[in-house]
Amino acid sequence: MLTATLTGDGETYMASLKSGLEETPNSPLLNWFSSGGDYNNYKKFSTDFPEHASAAYNMVAYGYANGEIGGKVDYEAAMKALDKSRELHDGPNALDSRAEIYAMSGDYLKARQNQFGAYDYASFASPYQPKLVTYWRKENKDEIVKNLKEAQVNLQNAILERNEEEYLKYVTEDMQLVAGDSNLQEFYEFTNESLNRQNDVNWNSFDLRDINVDFSPDMTMAILTFYADGSYTQGDSEDVVDYSTRASAVWIATDNGWKSVHANWAPYGGGSGIPKN
């Protein structure tokens, strides 16, 4: 059976498991191996082998949380199952599961508290650390949204004013900002040289509005969508061009805060973008 497991020989593995159960039907280990794939099987295992059921209770908790056991979501039953899991083995995995199930229920404060408990077992190179950060960000999502909206406005103002010191607060050396301008020319890497390049656009006004923020599930990336209105003249001309665009931007979470890595602009609502180079 071990050889079949190591070599990935599924047919031999299942035959060995069947033979083993026929010879030793009360083996907790062999019954555990045969329980996979169905939450109700894990529940049966926890009843048949209660002294060896820490891992089974952990899986049963997910069965309740997903509504796979009992036909409806039952977070209270899930937590009771995890309590039983911890009574048999007081390790980090059950705390990690409690955190994940609290997150499923939308309680990110309790999720983070339990994730801290799991993290305390092994803080060095801990596999529990990333979710700890995720739960903190979910718990503080409103504040992060507010800060990202402000950052997008500040970044755009820094670009318009060619304020390199301010601009550098919102980008990272680890990943170049890639932009697509509203003149619909090719995408390009927006560098310090791009920031300081002179052009003949004279802005009368430029305002962002209706900024919306969405996050990736792990809260490491944010997608901002928004609109921009304003007007400008070009060169010595006094003709005013009405500027109207829709845009999106990608921000990533780094060790130094949220940084912009992509922006895409396009004319919107009958207005114009910036002139072609």
PLM region descriptions:
Residues 2-9, 26-27, 34, 38, ...:
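Glycine-centered coil turns and helix-coil junctions that link the paired helices
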Residues 25-32, 53-56, 91-95, 120-133:
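Boundary/linker segments of alpha-helical solenoid repeat arrays
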Residues 133-173, 177, 274-277:
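Short, low-complexity N-terminal intrinsically disordered segments enriched in polar/charged residues
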Residues 164-217, 227, 241-243:
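A solvent-exposed, acidic/Ser-Thr-rich amphipathic alpha-helical stretch
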